[in-house]
């Protein structure tokens, strides 16, 4: 029977090591305002009324998860210890793990564990704007800076026109079966939208904002802390 009321599942790949942070601890567990970084990410997803369940995909040997108390996030949160060596592997493993629960018409929102400044209005806007879309899409922001293409010696080879260029963010939201098939067929993709594009489809860009940053380098932790400390709960 067709599901006329599709559900929304979040998948958070969190099996990476975060080597660019220069820390022995995986970056998703680095402290941020007294909690693991990923706690802030999961908290927003679990509190979102649009989201039915939140699946966090961890590495098989993750020993850090059990050292923290996640009970305050409620029953929506489900850890899956099936992560792979790449983001795409982890997302695909998560999709396969929930095959008994998700149906073809359900939506899946994939969100970076290292984007702890996701806000409720980001989720609300994404879900509302993509509700009737045949493909799905992703949060993104127009590129503001001038871009330079470098040669092999770090000299400027060309200036890249920034017109029509967008910086991809997450969540990225697609139908369950469409996303699973795209990832099963794709090779060398860095995000879900790339896999959907490789399948010949065109994801929609939903404009987000710069506060939804990804923590990649140590300075980003300080920026994330500032954003969370100064957030009012009302979209600016």
Curated annotation (Swiss-Prot):
Catalytic activity field: 2-C-methyl-D-erythritol 4-phosphate + CTP + H(+) = 4-CDP-2-C-methyl-D-erythritol + diphosphate
CDD domains associated with the record: CDP-ME_synthetase
InterPro entries (UniProt xref): IspD, IspD/TarI, IspD/TarI_cytidylyltransf_bact, ISPD_synthase_CS, Nucleotide-diphossugar_trans
Pathway participation: Isoprenoid biosynthesis; isopentenyl diphosphate biosynthesis via DXP pathway; isopentenyl diphosphate from 1-deoxy-D-xylulose 5-phosphate: step 2/6
Site (Positions MEP for the nucleophilic attack): 162, 214
EC number: 2.7.7.60
One Pfam family of this chain: IspD
Function of the molecule: Catalyzes the formation of 4-diphosphocytidyl-2-C-methyl-D-erythritol from CTP and 2-C-methyl-D-erythritol 4-phosphate (MEP).
Family listed: Belongs to the IspD/TarI cytidylyltransferase family. IspD subfamily.
Protein name: 2-C-methyl-D-erythritol 4-phosphate cytidylyltransferase
Provenance organism: Azoarcus sp. (strain BH72)
